[in-house]
Design a protein with these regions (language model features):
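Extracellular glycan-recognition regions
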Residues: 1-147
Length: 147
């Protein structure tokens, strides 16, 4: 159980490399439990992520910006592609989603990582439940490209 992404214990991370990088993941959210959230995040000293949350049996695309959660839209189906694009020179990140892995839709505003966490900037996958224990989040594949 965790209240926010930063408190989640279920994370798998990759240190950011290069000046320009893109991380993309295929998320199968068919087995989420109520209160569960799963997705893709990017962190420096702030934790920002995009993912799916299940609330009262319904699935929502949502953004989490350093603990503040914003529902974007209700989604149907079982799978979604999530992407984060990073520009280290400009200290800028952007989050995207797609249902076909071709047409990615910008989700939320670009933001700065505010580097400062001792681990450095990282991208990663996460899953946590705000109500208790339970549910599953399947990450089919993860791709990380950088220059």
């Amino acid at each position: 159980k965790a209240a926010t992404l930063r408190e989640s214990r279920n994370m798998l991370t990759q240190k950011c490399m290069g000046y320009l990088s893109t991380a993309t993941v295929l998320l199968d959210f068919s087995a989420l439990a109520d209160g569960q959230r799963g997705g893709l995040f990017c962190t420096g000293s702030l934790y920002n992520g995009i993912g799916i949350s299940r609330e009262e049996g319904k699935n929502y695309l949502y953004l989490e910006k350093n603990g503040d959660v914003q529902q974007v839209k209700m989604v149907s189906g079982k799978k979604i592609y999530l992407r984060v694009m990073l520009d280290a020179k400009k200290n800028r990140c952007q989050l995207f989603y797609s249902f076909d892995n071709r047409n990615f839709i910008l989700c939320g505003d670009a933001y700065s990582l505010k580097f400062g966490d001792w681990k450095g900037a990282r991208v990663g996958l996460y899953s946590y439940n705000t109500l208790g224990i339970g549910g599953k989040c399947y990450f089919d594949w993860f791709n990380y490209d950088f220059n």
